[in-house]
């Protein structure tokens, strides 16, 4: 049964694992690769089972570990064109990172009253 595992949350870094012990994705990677690998291991989750990293935006508290995690473990990165461009400019990704750009991936925030509540949507036709 898929679950949500908050690994890190806050201004010092954000990262969430969604999935099971066998398969999952990361939403953001806002800490170092080592810290994220350790946080997964503490929850008995293996980085080898991470199938993708979805990056909500390019701030370092959401994207700091993307380059190392994605290149070290061959994890595909998904985000918008604007976020990918900004991450490239900030050296948060490089040519060793497998990137998919899509306008059909987004974070929906219902209203200002629910700023901490969001959902990721992915158009499966791509």
Where are these regions (language model features)?
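Conserved beta-strand hairpin/beta-sheet module of binuclear metal-dependent hydrolase folds
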Residues: 1-43, 126
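Short, flexible loop segments at the rims of nucleotide/cofactor-binding pockets, characterized by
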Residues: 3-6, 53-56, 116-121
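A generic "binding-loop/recognition-motif" signal
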Residues: 12, 32, 59, 83, ...
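Active-site metal-binding motif and surrounding structural segment of the metallo-beta-lactamase
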Residues: 34-80
């Amino acid at each position: 049964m898929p679950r949500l595992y908050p690994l890190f949350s806050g201004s010092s870094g954000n990262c969430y694992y969604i999935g099971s012990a066998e398969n999952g994705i990361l939403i953001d990677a806002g800490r170092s690769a080592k810290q994220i690998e350790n946080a997964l291991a503490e929850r008995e989750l293996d980085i080898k089972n991470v199938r993708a990293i979805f990056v909500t935006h390019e701030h370092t508290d959401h994207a700091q570990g993307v380059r190392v995690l994605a290149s070290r473990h061959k994890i595909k990165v998904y985000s918008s064109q604007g976020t990918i461009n900004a991450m490239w400019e900030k050296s948060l990704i490089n040519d060793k990172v497998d990137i998919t750009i899509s306008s059909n991936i987004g974070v929906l925030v219902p209203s200002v009253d629910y700023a901490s509540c969001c959902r990721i949507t992915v158009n499966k036709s791509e």
